[in-house]
């Protein structure tokens, strides 16, 4: 028993040390990435270079309490979520951003109740080791936005041919739609996200993105829109920031190579771009 207690204490201290290190270190890979197959296209961007539209949409849709909540999660909501799960009902709230990030960094995909409880414990450790801004920055850099595509830097260049500081509201809504099922998201040959209902993946993304285009603006209207960004202590606009090493203002080479490898003939590319505008 004493041996087990020592092991648990060592694991707890190691986890705390890892979370504290995230104040200075950008993790090159996460447990969630290792669960996937293939490459991990993952280029980092500092939060100050991310469009305020994307930041506001992410907070409003994923965790509107993030700017003001002291704890990693809302424990009342967590208990209701646990009760719903034990009664075989759907999740009434969804996981807040610190819980999602802690899971992505260290844990494995599972619906096991014990694993879910571990999510919550790690979320509490995380928010007391790093700032809320840093939590959001890491979340946006580690979230999956497509097969092998991780982080908003790679996502904006891959889908929209633009840096993350030039995203529009509509770009943000579309990426919010990709988050629930990123393995089905693909780039159109001329740019944009494939939402062609004639293909299985396109049909899935069409439904998810159209839903996000309805619900994310509603969430923003309820929760304060860009005021959420200011509540996080983020001021100014992203594209007015001076260039820096983590600005992601140049297309990453691995994304350029991926686009080139998947490029279709010019005629098909033109048709795809026209289709994107037709359904936007």
Which ranges hold each PLM region?
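Juxtamembrane regions of bacterial inner-membrane/periplasmic proteins
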Residues: 1-280
């Amino acid at each position: 028993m004493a041996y087990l207690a020592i092991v648990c204490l060592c694991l707890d201290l190691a986890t705390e040390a890892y979370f504290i290190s995230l104040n200075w270190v950008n993790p090159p890979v996460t447990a969630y990435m290792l669960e996937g197959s293939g490459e991990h296209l993952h280029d980092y961007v500092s939060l100050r270079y991310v469009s305020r539209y994307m930041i506001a949409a992410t907070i409003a849709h994923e965790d509107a309490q993030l700017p003001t909540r002291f704890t990693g999660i809302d424990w009342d909501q967590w208990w209701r979520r646990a009760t719903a799960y034990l009664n075989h009902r759907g999740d009434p709230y969804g996981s807040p951003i610190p819980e999602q990030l802690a899971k992505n960094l260290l844990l494995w995909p599972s619906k096991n109740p014990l694993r879910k409880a571990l999510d919550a414990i790690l979320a509490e450790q995380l928010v007391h080791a790093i700032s809320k801004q840093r939590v959001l920055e890491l979340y946006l850099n580690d979230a999956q936005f497509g097969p092998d595509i991780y982080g908003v830097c790679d996502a904006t260049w891959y889908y929209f041919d633009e840096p993350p500081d030039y995203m529009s509201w509509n770009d943000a809504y579309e990426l919010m739609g990709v988050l629930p099922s990123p393995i089905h998201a693909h780039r159109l040959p001329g740019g944009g996200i494939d939402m062609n209902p004639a293909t299985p993946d396109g049909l899935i993304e069409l439904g998810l993105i159209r839903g996000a285009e309805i619900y994310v603006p509603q969430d923003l209207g309820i929760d304060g829109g860009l005021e959420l960004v200011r509540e996080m202590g983020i001021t100014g606009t992203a594209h007015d920031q001076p260039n820096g090493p983590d600005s992601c203002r140049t297309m990453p080479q691995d994304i350029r190579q991926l686009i080139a490898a998947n490029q279709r003939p010019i005629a098909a590319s033109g048709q795809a771009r026209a289709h994107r505008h037709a359904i936007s």
